Every structure is written in C-alpha cells, then in structure tokens.
Amino acid sequence: SSEVSQLLVSAYPAAHPAYLTEMYSDNTDEQMHSTWSAFDRFQEQAYQWKDIDEVRNAETPYQLWEAHYTAVATANEAIAHINSVNNAHDYDAQLGEALLCRAFAMFQLSTVFCQAYDKTTAQNNLGLAYPTEPEKVVGRLIERGTLAQLYNNIEKDLLQGLELVGTKYARPKFHFTKQAAY
C-alpha cells in the first residue's frame, strides 16, 4: 500500500489556475504609464482576454489542461491497481484519496474550461471528458458529455472518496485526509 501512496503524490495537479483566473478577474488593472509593461506575454494575453498561445508558463490553459488530466490519469492507475488486488479493502484509504484527487482535478478543470454551473442550464452546457480508467489505447476519444454529467461524476467520486479516505498519513501535508478533504 505504500507504493500506491507514493504514486498518489503524482495525482495532485502540478499546476493551479490561481494566476490565470486572477488575470481574468476585476482584481487586475492596467497601469497606463509609459514605464509599465506586462510581466510576460501570457499575463498580457490573459489580462486582455485574448486567445492564449503562450505555453511555457505553468498556468497557461494548455499547462493547466495537461497537469490536471495527468493527475486524473495517475488517480485512474491507482484505482485500477487497487481494484485488481485480492486485498483491496486494505487500500480503502488510498482508494478514497485517488477518488478525491480525480474529483478535485476535474472540478478545477471545470472552473477554467466550462460555463459556471447552473442547474437550469447544466443539461445543455458542455462538460468535459471524465476518464475513469487508465488509457490503454492512444488517441481514444472519451465523450465530453454535459456539465450536469460532469458534476454528477465529480460528486460521485467526492462522496465515495470521503467515505473511504483515512484520517492519518505518514506525511499528511501531501495527501488528502478526511480532515483536509472537508
């Protein structure tokens, strides 16, 4: 089980949308001084709501997409391994953590790449592909589904993960625990 716990360290996204969403927010203001310039091209593109083609910054849409779906893929590998062993019950805490990691990564993606959730329109708005098993076929297409389906999948993983995740970890700073998940 310690190997699965070590694998799950990689089920947390290596990029976060805070900088991107701050640039998109009304907390950002352009300084109209001749000495001011954007920190970098990514900041300028985000602030001006332009298509972002800069990919080197860790918080560009491209990097966010890659980091979060990589985290989902890692969580899926852990889940598949746990489901394949005879003593799967011994891995309940890790299964809970993997489900929480997958739910967290997909929720983060939804906040950047989907419309805001509204129960009156969620059935008609596009969601995101929600992989639930390891990729075995390169380029396999996964149906995108609706925003309602996406949030139902997130909620299912979240509730099941909360039920299973443990309260102790050798290094709790780097893993979901029941306390951290709430």
Regions found by a protein language model. Name each.
Residues V112-N152, K156:
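Short coil/linker segments at helix-helix boundaries
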Residues Y24-H33, Q115-N124, T167-A180:
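Short, surface-exposed recognition loops and adjoining beta-strand edges that mediate ligand/DNA contacts
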Residues Y19-Q43:
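N-terminal, post-signal-peptide region of Sec/Tat-exported proteins
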Residues A71-I79, Y130-P131, Q179-Y182:
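Well-ordered alpha-helical segments within folded domains of soluble proteins
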Residues F42-F113, L141, G145, Q160-P172:
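Conserved, well-structured interaction surfaces
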Residues A148-Y182:
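Internal metal/ion-chelating core segments
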Residues S1-T28:
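Acidic, glycine-rich segments characteristic of secretory precursors and extracytoplasmic regions
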Residues H68, G96, L128, T177-Q179:
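Start-of-helix signal in alpha-solenoid helical-repeat scaffolds, especially tetratricopeptide repeats
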